[in-house]
């Protein structure tokens, strides 16, 4: 199936160098170099480095703060009160991949006392592991989506898109296209999953901001095309609503790799 996808991709229009505002490729390369200099074997980025890399490509992220103490968590929550005054707290330690499965997330926290109790709970249960917590405002309602990148040993980076949240592994409803994406590719990618009608709505009345969603996928594609060291990226969930899209949780893994030209349509 991937061979057929690649043949169609090569037969399609040339992949344009899409004019995306706010792309800082050189800064992104510096972020990657600094990380790999410190971690020669690669690995999963810590929250601050991950957010820094995403900001190089203008990828919209929910506001957040890092806290290593109970008092810092309370101060962060005070600054970041979200929907109905609530916040979310997520534990972090190197190697933590599935926070929900590890029960390392507290939702719907109100007031200082609940924030303190949540921090103490995480600190107690993950003693010796936890290096700190991420505090975020509780996001308003929307459709939870998945966007990501994986590397194929033969074809290079693939951009993934589909239904996100806790339903990701259960429903396995996602599609993939080779990076870099064209305008045509990104439209196909959004409409390919079985759940696409949830986004497109009845009679063409979209329930999310499709233009912002396309921008997110194009920016992710650009990051994959720029950075051969990008072994894996997982944005889940991405909250999509009529007012825009926002990445609520992101994981990025880097590996040392040789640069390569991803714009292979030039060679056909």
Q: What is the meaning of each model-derived region?
A:
Residues 1-268:
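ATP-dependent carboxylate/acyl-activation modules
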């Amino acid at each position: 199936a991937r061979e057929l996808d690649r043949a169609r991709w090569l037969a399609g229009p040339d992949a344009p160098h899409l004019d995306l505002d706010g792309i800082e490729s050189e800064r992104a390369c510096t972020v990657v170099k600094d990380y790999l200099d410190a971690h020669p074997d690669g690995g999963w980025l810590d929250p601050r480095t991950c957010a820094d890399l995403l900001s190089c490509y203008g990828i919209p992220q929910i506001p957040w703060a890092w806290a290593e103490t109970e008092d810092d968590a309370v101060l962060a929550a005070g600054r970041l009160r979200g929907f109905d005054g609530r916040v979310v707290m997520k534990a972090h330690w190197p190697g933590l991949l599935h926070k929900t499965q590890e029960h390392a997330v507290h939702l719907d926290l109100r007031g200082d006392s609940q924030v303190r109790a949540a921090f103490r709970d995480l600190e107690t249960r993950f003693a010796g592991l936890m290096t700190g917590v991420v505090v975020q405002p509780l996001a308003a309602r929307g459709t939870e989506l998945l966007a990501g990148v994986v590397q194929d040993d033969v074809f290079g980076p693939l951009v993934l898109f589909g239904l996100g949240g806790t339903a990701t592994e259960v429903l396995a409803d996602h599609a993939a296209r080779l990076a870099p994406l064209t305008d045509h590719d990104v439209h196909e990618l959004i409409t390919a999953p079985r759940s696409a009608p949830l986004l497109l709505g009845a009679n063409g009345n979209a329930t999310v901001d499709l233009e912002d969603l396309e921008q997110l996928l194009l920016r992710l594609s650009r990051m994959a095309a720029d950075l051969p060291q990008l072994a894996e990226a997982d944005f889940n969930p991405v909250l999509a609503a009529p007012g825009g899209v926002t990445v609520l949780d992101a994981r990025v893994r880097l590996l040392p790799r040789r640069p390569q030209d991803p714009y292979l349509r030039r060679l056909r």
